Amino acid sequence: LSKSKQKIIVIGAGIGGLTAAALLAKRGYEVVVYDLALVAGGCASTFKRRGFTFDVGATQVAGLESGGIHDRIFKELEIELPEATYCDPACAVFLPNESEPINVWRDRHKWKLERQKQFPNSEPLWNFLEDLFWRSWRFQSRDPILPPRNFWDAWQLIKALRVDTLATVPYTFSTVGDALRGFGLANDHRLRTFLDLQLKLYSQVNAEETALLYAATALAVSQTPLGLFHLKGSMQVLSDRLIESIERDGGKVLMQHRVSEIKETGKRKKVKVESLRTVETWWDEADHVVANVTVNNFVQLLGEQAPKGYAKRVKNLKPASVAFVVYLGVNRAAIPENCPPHLQFLEAYEHSIAYKPHSLFVSVSKEGDGRAPDGKATIIASEFTDAEVWYGGEDYQELKKKFTERAIAQLSEYFHLNEETIIHVEAATPQTFERYTGRDRGIVGGVGMRVSTFGPFGFANRTPLKNIWLVGDSTHPGEGTAGVSYSALTVVRQIEQSS
């Protein structure tokens, strides 16, 4: 079949699904995207309240720099990259009982001076991480396929290897915890806590468990020549541009359409679609199906057809992260002067209190960035929480109220929050995320970047079922709009090669 005769169904209009769909449509395939939400973008979409625009989950973007993954893909699609400003510092991290933050500066030298001041004796570790990062980054920029599942995948992986990549191989099974011990820093509480806070944002797990090779990249992506970006308008512009590209190239994006089943019937693949507007259901069929869903949802979609070993592996995964998020619309007076765009707060050190201390990751809008009316701002604060808490039968509204009040109290130690400055308050729980994104139990950020689930040991885009593909943060290289865009590009290359 020529491309124009081949049909591809994409399940999920997250950034991974939309990117795959846009690239496939541009390359001549017939593409249709189904998503249950009203607004595209998944965890990188937005909602509006009283003149405020809130980014739902993702608030910063990597890969917009020249040669970055979004830049490469948008060039191929022949669409304009959205306007954005650098996040500098990428994050201001407040450790317990400290009034001055650790600023993760974009400038490499400035960041080096900052970490030498904050963490004396740790420079050998940072230099080691930076060396691993550059080797890994050069490798990733050659588009390897991880983990490989057939000869062609393995050949793409081999072609991406160079002599300088080999130096990273001995560390494939190492964690950041191992590196801290190796450099004699295992008992540096401030450093370990800082790494825990930063890594949890990207890897979903703490320093002790995070795969070293993944961490090297996660910890270096904030600095030049890369960097984290704050999109002008809102996160929604990313999805909007991708949808324009899909529709320009003849593809369709159908929102409020839920896919509940994938069936393999010989060469053709079928998916069961339900229109949430008309409640009609039907089966649509295609040559390929690309599932932009979590691996947990993927197994549910396959039902009885899921290979036993695959389903068992998913069942045995450690529970993924879930988040509780508070969205505040405030007067600018609530924001301290020179407030950085992203902050982290940790209420106490683990050993100092009886329960697990709460940490918040906070994003603050800039004046004139399109997220709030003049003289006003948005504050979005998220914390990791356990799914068990939210699905354990406790009074849901009561729990939501308790979490909201606690988060606002913690934020009030830095921001000026009171009845005069707070205009709008809203919260999202794991159940909210599940309802709007369809992600099983509202999980965020993928399967967690432990050694057992990252890179070579992760879930492949090429699934055990022929021409049924997995894309998104359950696959290499993991979470974030840049991560899922790499995942999408991999799937598109694999589909092209197989067809």
Regions found by a protein language model. Give the residues of each.
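C-terminal segments that line or cap access tunnels to active or ligand-binding sites in enzymes
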Residues: 331-434
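Mid-domain catalytic core of redox enzymes
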Residues: 231, 257-373
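A glycine-rich dinucleotide-binding beta-alpha-beta segment and adjacent secondary-structure elements
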Residues: 190-205, 361, 417-477
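Active-site/ligand-binding neighborhood in enzyme catalytic cores
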Residues: 130-249, 439-451
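Short loop/edge segments at beta-strand edges and connector loops
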Residues: 88, 239, 255-257, 263
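N-terminal glycine-rich phosphate/pyrophosphate-binding loop and immediately adjacent elements
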Residues: 3-141
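A conserved beta-strand/loop element that lines the FAD pocket in flavoprotein oxidoreductases
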Residues: 246-259
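A conserved FAD-binding loop/helix module that cradles the flavin
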Residues: 58, 473-496
